[in-house]
Amino acid sequence: MLKSSNKRKSKEEKKLQEGKYLGVRRRPWGRYAAEIRNPFTKERHWLGTFDTAEEAAFAYDVAARSISGSLATTNFFYTENTSLERHPQQSLEPHMTWGSSSLCLLQDQPFENNHFVADPISSSFSQKQESSTNLTNTFSHCYNDGDHVGQSKEISLPNDMSNSLFGHQDKVGEHDNADHMKFGSVLSDEPLCFEYDYIGNYLQSFLKDVNDDAPQFLM
Protein backbone atom coordinates (compact mmCIF):
# COMPACT_ATOMS: atom_id res chain seq x y z
CA MET A 1 0.00 0.00 0.00
CA LEU A 2 2.79 2.39 0.87
CA LYS A 3 4.61 1.72 -2.38
CA SER A 4 1.51 2.29 -4.49
CA SER A 5 0.70 5.52 -2.68
CA ASN A 6 4.26 6.74 -3.12
CA LYS A 7 4.10 5.98 -6.84
CA ARG A 8 0.87 7.91 -7.16
CA LYS A 9 2.35 10.86 -5.36
CA SER A 10 5.43 10.83 -7.56
CA LYS A 11 3.29 10.68 -10.70
CA GLU A 12 1.15 13.54 -9.49
CA GLU A 13 4.21 15.61 -8.66
CA LYS A 14 5.67 14.94 -12.10
CA LYS A 15 2.42 15.96 -13.76
CA LEU A 16 2.31 19.15 -11.73
CA GLN A 17 5.94 19.86 -12.54
CA GLU A 18 5.33 19.17 -16.21
CA GLY A 19 2.42 21.58 -16.38
CA LYS A 20 4.22 24.15 -14.28
CA TYR A 21 6.46 25.48 -17.04
CA LEU A 22 5.52 26.83 -20.45
CA GLY A 23 6.77 24.89 -23.45
CA VAL A 24 8.04 21.95 -21.36
CA ARG A 25 6.93 18.34 -21.76
CA ARG A 26 8.19 15.28 -19.93
CA ARG A 27 9.34 12.33 -21.98
CA PRO A 28 8.30 8.78 -20.97
CA TRP A 29 11.92 7.93 -20.13
CA GLY A 30 12.22 10.83 -17.69
CA ARG A 31 13.83 13.66 -19.67
CA TYR A 32 12.19 16.98 -20.46
CA ALA A 33 11.59 18.40 -23.91
CA ALA A 34 11.25 22.09 -24.71
CA GLU A 35 9.64 23.73 -27.71
CA ILE A 36 8.19 27.12 -28.54
CA ARG A 37 5.61 28.46 -30.95
CA ASN A 38 6.42 31.67 -32.79
CA PRO A 39 3.39 33.96 -32.41
CA PHE A 40 4.23 35.83 -35.60
CA THR A 41 4.87 32.95 -38.03
CA LYS A 42 2.75 30.35 -36.18
CA GLU A 43 5.64 27.89 -36.46
CA ARG A 44 6.86 25.54 -33.73
CA HIS A 45 10.57 25.45 -32.95
CA TRP A 46 12.17 22.47 -31.25
CA LEU A 47 14.60 23.49 -28.50
CA GLY A 48 15.91 20.09 -27.35
CA THR A 49 15.70 17.69 -24.40
CA PHE A 50 17.07 18.40 -20.93
CA ASP A 51 17.77 16.59 -17.68
CA THR A 52 15.55 18.81 -15.54
CA ALA A 53 12.38 20.77 -16.09
CA GLU A 54 14.09 23.97 -14.96
CA GLU A 55 16.68 23.72 -17.73
CA ALA A 56 13.98 23.15 -20.32
CA ALA A 57 12.03 26.11 -18.94
CA PHE A 58 15.11 28.30 -19.10
CA ALA A 59 15.65 27.32 -22.75
CA TYR A 60 12.06 28.29 -23.47
CA ASP A 61 12.58 31.67 -21.79
CA VAL A 62 15.68 32.38 -23.87
CA ALA A 63 13.81 31.60 -27.08
CA ALA A 64 10.76 33.61 -26.02
CA ARG A 65 12.85 36.67 -25.16
CA SER A 66 14.71 36.42 -28.46
CA ILE A 67 11.38 36.50 -30.31
CA SER A 68 9.28 38.97 -28.33
CA GLY A 69 11.88 40.78 -26.24
CA SER A 70 10.92 42.03 -22.79
CA LEU A 71 7.21 41.56 -23.57
CA ALA A 72 7.57 37.77 -23.81
CA THR A 73 5.74 35.50 -21.37
CA THR A 74 8.40 33.50 -19.52
CA ASN A 75 8.61 30.87 -16.83
CA PHE A 76 10.92 32.90 -14.61
CA PHE A 77 11.08 36.57 -13.73
CA TYR A 78 13.75 38.63 -15.47
CA THR A 79 14.74 42.25 -15.09
CA GLU A 80 15.75 44.43 -18.00
CA ASN A 81 19.43 44.11 -17.06
CA THR A 82 19.32 40.33 -16.82
CA SER A 83 21.78 38.73 -19.24
CA LEU A 84 20.90 35.25 -20.47
CA GLU A 85 24.49 34.17 -21.07
CA ARG A 86 24.24 30.76 -19.45
CA HIS A 87 22.94 28.14 -21.85
CA PRO A 88 21.63 24.94 -20.25
CA GLN A 89 23.22 21.67 -21.17
CA GLN A 90 21.04 19.84 -23.63
CA SER A 91 21.23 16.76 -25.79
CA LEU A 92 20.54 17.22 -29.46
CA GLU A 93 18.55 14.86 -31.57
CA PRO A 94 20.57 12.92 -34.20
CA HIS A 95 19.11 14.97 -37.06
CA MET A 96 19.71 18.35 -35.40
CA THR A 97 22.78 20.57 -35.33
CA TRP A 98 23.65 23.84 -33.71
CA GLY A 99 23.16 25.58 -37.03
CA SER A 100 19.49 24.67 -37.34
CA SER A 101 16.90 27.42 -37.26
CA SER A 102 15.29 26.18 -34.07
CA LEU A 103 18.50 26.17 -32.05
CA CYS A 104 19.57 29.54 -33.35
CA LEU A 105 16.92 31.02 -31.10
CA LEU A 106 18.97 29.94 -28.08
CA GLN A 107 22.01 31.92 -29.08
CA ASP A 108 22.03 35.20 -27.20
CA GLN A 109 25.54 36.32 -28.04
CA PRO A 110 26.54 39.76 -29.40
CA PHE A 111 26.51 40.14 -33.14
CA GLU A 112 30.22 40.74 -33.45
CA ASN A 113 31.03 37.45 -31.71
CA ASN A 114 29.53 35.52 -34.62
CA HIS A 115 32.21 36.72 -37.04
CA PHE A 116 35.82 35.81 -37.42
CA VAL A 117 38.34 38.36 -36.26
CA ALA A 118 41.29 38.96 -38.50
CA ASP A 119 44.65 38.02 -37.06
CA PRO A 120 46.39 41.32 -36.16
CA ILE A 121 49.83 39.93 -37.01
CA SER A 122 48.87 38.67 -40.47
CA SER A 123 46.86 41.80 -41.25
CA SER A 124 49.72 44.12 -40.27
CA PHE A 125 52.17 42.07 -42.33
CA SER A 126 49.89 42.23 -45.38
CA GLN A 127 49.56 46.00 -44.98
CA LYS A 128 53.34 46.39 -44.78
CA GLN A 129 53.79 44.17 -47.81
CA GLU A 130 51.24 46.17 -49.79
CA SER A 131 52.78 49.50 -48.81
CA SER A 132 56.30 48.31 -49.67
CA THR A 133 55.08 47.08 -53.07
CA ASN A 134 53.57 50.46 -53.82
CA LEU A 135 56.77 52.20 -52.75
CA THR A 136 59.08 50.02 -54.84
CA ASN A 137 56.97 50.16 -57.99
CA THR A 138 56.88 53.98 -58.19
CA PHE A 139 59.37 56.71 -57.44
CA SER A 140 59.66 60.43 -58.07
CA HIS A 141 62.51 62.40 -59.53
CA CYS A 142 63.24 66.00 -60.44
CA TYR A 143 64.05 67.27 -63.86
CA ASN A 144 64.86 70.53 -65.58
CA ASP A 145 63.17 71.38 -68.86
CA GLY A 146 63.75 75.12 -68.87
CA ASP A 147 60.61 76.67 -67.45
CA HIS A 148 59.73 73.90 -65.02
CA VAL A 149 62.44 73.29 -62.48
CA GLY A 150 62.00 70.95 -59.58
CA GLN A 151 58.69 69.47 -60.74
CA SER A 152 57.77 66.02 -59.47
CA LYS A 153 57.03 63.18 -61.85
CA GLU A 154 56.15 59.56 -61.11
CA ILE A 155 57.63 56.73 -63.16
CA SER A 156 56.43 53.13 -62.93
CA LEU A 157 59.09 50.45 -62.88
CA PRO A 158 58.76 46.73 -63.63
CA ASN A 159 58.59 44.48 -60.60
CA ASP A 160 61.92 42.79 -61.30
CA MET A 161 63.76 46.10 -61.70
CA SER A 162 62.14 47.68 -58.65
CA ASN A 163 63.02 44.65 -56.52
CA SER A 164 66.65 44.74 -57.68
CA LEU A 165 66.94 48.48 -57.08
CA PHE A 166 65.32 48.78 -53.68
CA GLY A 167 65.61 45.29 -52.23
CA HIS A 168 63.04 42.52 -52.03
CA GLN A 169 59.65 43.70 -50.78
CA ASP A 170 59.34 40.95 -48.16
CA LYS A 171 62.60 42.01 -46.53
CA VAL A 172 61.46 45.60 -46.49
CA GLY A 173 58.26 44.71 -44.69
CA GLU A 174 60.12 42.45 -42.26
CA HIS A 175 62.77 44.95 -41.13
CA ASP A 176 60.51 48.04 -41.25
CA ASN A 177 62.79 49.92 -43.64
CA ALA A 178 59.96 51.43 -45.65
CA ASP A 179 60.81 54.90 -44.35
CA HIS A 180 64.11 54.82 -46.25
CA MET A 181 62.23 54.36 -49.54
CA LYS A 182 59.86 57.33 -49.44
CA PHE A 183 60.70 59.08 -52.70
CA GLY A 184 58.67 61.78 -54.37
CA SER A 185 59.04 64.92 -52.27
CA VAL A 186 60.46 67.80 -54.33
CA LEU A 187 63.51 69.52 -52.88
CA SER A 188 62.90 73.29 -53.26
CA ASP A 189 64.01 74.59 -56.70
CA GLU A 190 67.07 72.43 -57.29
CA PRO A 191 67.03 70.78 -60.73
CA LEU A 192 68.49 67.49 -59.51
CA CYS A 193 67.47 65.19 -56.69
CA PHE A 194 69.30 62.45 -54.83
CA GLU A 195 66.87 59.78 -55.97
CA TYR A 196 67.48 60.51 -59.63
CA ASP A 197 71.25 60.47 -59.17
CA TYR A 198 71.03 57.19 -57.33
CA ILE A 199 69.07 55.54 -60.14
CA GLY A 200 71.37 56.95 -62.80
CA ASN A 201 74.51 55.79 -61.02
CA TYR A 202 73.05 52.35 -60.51
CA LEU A 203 72.09 51.98 -64.17
CA GLN A 204 75.52 53.14 -65.31
CA SER A 205 77.28 50.65 -63.06
CA PHE A 206 74.90 47.92 -64.22
CA LEU A 207 75.59 48.63 -67.91
CA LYS A 208 79.31 48.74 -67.19
CA ASP A 209 79.22 45.30 -65.59
CA VAL A 210 77.32 43.94 -68.59
CA ASN A 211 79.86 45.37 -71.02
CA ASP A 212 82.76 44.00 -69.01
CA ASP A 213 81.27 40.52 -68.96
CA ALA A 214 80.52 40.51 -72.70
CA PRO A 215 82.97 38.41 -74.84
CA GLN A 216 85.58 40.41 -76.72
CA PHE A 217 85.98 39.60 -80.40
CA LEU A 218 89.27 40.26 -82.12
CA MET A 219 89.02 41.97 -85.47
From Swiss-Prot:
Similarity comment: family membership: Belongs to the AP2/ERF transcription factor family. ERF subfamily.
DNA-binding region, residues: 20-77
GO function terms (MF aspect): DNA binding; DNA-binding transcription factor activity
Subcellular location: Nucleus
InterPro entries assigned to the protein according to its UniProt record, in alphabetical order: AP2/ERF_dom (IPR001471), AP2/ERF_dom_sf (IPR036955), DNA-bd_dom_sf (IPR016177)
The keyword DNA-binding is assigned to this record: yes
GO terms under cellular component: nucleus
Main location: nucleus
SMART domains: AP2
Organism: Arabidopsis thaliana
TM helices/strands, residue ranges: none
PANTHER family membership: AP2 DOMAIN CLASS TRANSCRIPTION FACTOR (PTHR31677), ETHYLENE-RESPONSIVE TRANSCRIPTION FACTOR ERF088 (PTHR31677:SF87)
Function: Probably acts as a transcriptional activator. Binds to the GCC-box pathogenesis-related promoter element. May be involved in the regulation of gene expression by stress factors and by components of stress signal transduction pathways.
CDD domains the record matches: AP2
Protein name, as recorded: Ethylene-responsive transcription factor ERF088
GO terms of biological process kind: ethylene-activated signaling pathway
Pfam families tied to this protein: AP2
UniProt keyword annotations, A-Z: Activator, DNA-binding, Ethylene signaling pathway, Nucleus, Transcription, Transcription regulation
SUPFAM superfamilies according to UniProt: DNA-binding domain
